[in-house]
């Protein structure tokens, strides 16, 4: 496997993840709502929706932009497969570049 980056995870983050896991609310609930509020404030925007994966985020982004059949989306040739898969999922054409 080619490592693209070394994770830098603080002890505070590890502790918070433990709290969330023990709460049983992994998908919705107070932690997700608080994170969305904090992120919206940090970004200076009104609304934020967090999703479960980068794949879901890419998919929603393309849908929000109205990308679909007849569109071409340029993606890097060296990337996670989802980068191209979501383009195909919305009916657009993937164009690989390097």
What are these regions (language model features)?
Residues 63-98:
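PLP-dependent aminotransferase-like
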């Amino acid at each position: 496997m080619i490592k693209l980056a070394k994770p830098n995870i603080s002890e505070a983050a590890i502790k918070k993840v433990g709290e969330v896991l023990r709460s049983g609310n992994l998908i919705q609930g107070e932690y997700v709502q608080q994170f969305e509020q904090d992120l919206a404030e940090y970004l200076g925007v009104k609304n934020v929706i967090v999703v479960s994966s980068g794949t879901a985020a890419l998919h929603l982004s393309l849908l929000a932009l109205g990308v679909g059949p007849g569109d071409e989306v340029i993606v890097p040739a060296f990337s996670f497969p989802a980068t191209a898969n979501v383009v195909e999922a919305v009916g657009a054409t993937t164009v690989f570049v390097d």
